[in-house]
């Protein structure tokens, strides 16, 4: 069961959260999740946090976050890296451990500071005798560059668009709608149940409170996006506007078995169902969420038309569009409050963010079935079925 969860507002690259490490953001999210669950830190038995960009982050980022959140030194922690799938995999692993009776209470989530990703001087340990030296960007090299085809994942997605035939206007319209829906959701207070403010210290005076995702542009239109240049190929259809934003943030959920929750007198947002995990046949991204959802649906024994809430990570507009088309989804139930194109995509966090958001939607409905799904670098996909608590 997902008892409760919390996330930070998402900051833009070099934005409001630029001075926070991933672990510091993770600690804020963990503490917030425990408070929303009304669960004391002393009950937590294990912590699992996803993080992709760990170079320079120090030993055991998940444990750093756990200890900073007030969880005891006697509680083990695990940092996992499955690229964009890390945050959803953390929840799935927590569920599996609880079902195996290893633990009763697990905190799972994801954290990322893409701003803090350092640059890498490869082979420096063996020294350089002569000539120029190349410095690599950890964010690009270990986060956004496809290792199998040696090109940015956006360029790889552009290649697949040649097959899928999504037009520039289709992608621009989808991206504009993501911003518009996210802006409307903030205005209507939809995110209030999940976002906790972050206090940002100032040189003098009281800290400022960072309270809202800062990448959302309420006045975004498809016409405005049509003026952007292609990002990965001169004749391409993907722009900075139809790709997810580079961002900082963290999210966490409290996962618990039903017996423990009942013993503590707690309610829960959603019950965790089947987990769909897929890969291949190559490293492209577009079909992976749909493939993972199909696998999860099959394991759950339900059909796609039984889904009420669908959250698909908007790595690119083309990924969400492919998922909708391949599954035959009603677009009206997909990312109803916007997605990563608008709010941002801190790599290790996003899987937890969309799972929490789907769980909260189901809780507000009081019934129904949902799914959260993402594509991941290397051509992988994960999906998690949720049922209203």
Swiss-Prot record:
It is an enzyme of class 2 (transferase). PROSITE patterns: THIOLASE_1 (PS00098), THIOLASE_2 (PS00737), THIOLASE_3 (PS00099). Its EC number is 2.3.1.9. Keywords: Acyltransferase, Transferase. The keyword Transferase applies. GO terms for molecular function: acetyl-CoA C-acetyltransferase activity. Pfam families: Thiolase_C, Thiolase_N. SUPFAM superfamilies: Thiolase-like. It catalyses: 2 acetyl-CoA = acetoacetyl-CoA + CoA. Coiled coil: none annotated. The active site is at 84 (acyl-thioester intermediate), 345 (proton acceptor), 375 (proton acceptor). InterPro entries: Thiolase, Thiolase-like, Thiolase_acyl_enz_int_AS, Thiolase_AS, Thiolase_C, Thiolase_CS, Thiolase_N. Belongs to the thiolase-like superfamily. Thiolase family. PANTHER family: ACETYL-COA ACETYLTRANSFERASE, CYTOSOLIC, ACETYL-COA C-ACYLTRANSFERASE. NCBIfam families: AcCoA-C-Actrans. This is Probable acetyl-CoA acetyltransferase. It comes from Mycobacterium bovis (strain ATCC BAA-935 / AF2122/97). The gene is fadA4.
